[in-house]
Amino acid sequence: MIIVISPAKSQNFEPIKTAYQFTQPIFKQQIIKLINTLKHYEVEEIEKLMKISPKLAEEVFAKHNSFNPNKYDNSNAKAAIFTFSGDVYKGLEADTLDNKTIEYAQNHLLMLSGLYGLVRPLDLIQAYRLEMGTNIKIDGKILHKYWQDKITTQLNEYFSQQQNKILINLASNEYSQAIDKKSLAVKWLDIDFKENKAGAYKTIGIHAKKARGLITRYILENRIENVSDIKKFNVAGYQFNPDFSDENLLCFTR
């Protein structure tokens, strides 16, 4: 069983205290091609491309131009699971997971990324900003199409080493479309979270994002390897709701 989640635009590069066996990014040649493309963009072009403020565009320009795709170590990079710090990662709280759980996560959790493609928890990453939905073409393909074959092939390889061949999709649509479901030789399972608002159940973005992190943590900490045990998730008031679920979707409500 492998969980896939989205990355986060917010990143924290404060050093971590615990020593791990860090790993290098999977798709180094593709990263070189992408970062070299991004380095050609001036500040004003980044502002338009990414639809961000001039100040933020300057920061992104600086990040990309200081990016060294031939060197990933503690001087310029940090393990991905401790670097991303958006809502999903606030729910995950990776810095409070024990060493054994982080090591387990290395083989059971993957992050999708516009720049890195697929990222394992202990892969070292440098500061960047490139959302999968960015309107940029590489080799004549939009970004998620550029990554699709590469990511799907790598996932199939990882699943060949897994006993339970289930992909738990906790990524947003923007990122999960970078996986070719038809070419993925495993079961695909989506998970959704809904809130009861005045008697009607609705998916509310900020709550759903944090819940994705909470259930990721739950699966990792409990070493869950089957769907029936995922249904037992009952953190932060969420309960499995069969009325909104089917064989390809687990929905939790509160």
From Swiss-Prot:
InterPro entries: YaaA. Disulfide bonds: none annotated. GO terms for cellular component: cytosol. One of its GO terms (biological process) is response to hydroperoxide. It comes from the Bacteria. Pfam families: H2O2_YaaD. HAMAP family: UPF0246. Belongs to the UPF0246 family. NCBIfam families: PRK02101.1-3 (NF002542). This is UPF0246 protein FTM_0239. It comes from Francisella tularensis subsp. mediasiatica (strain FSC147).
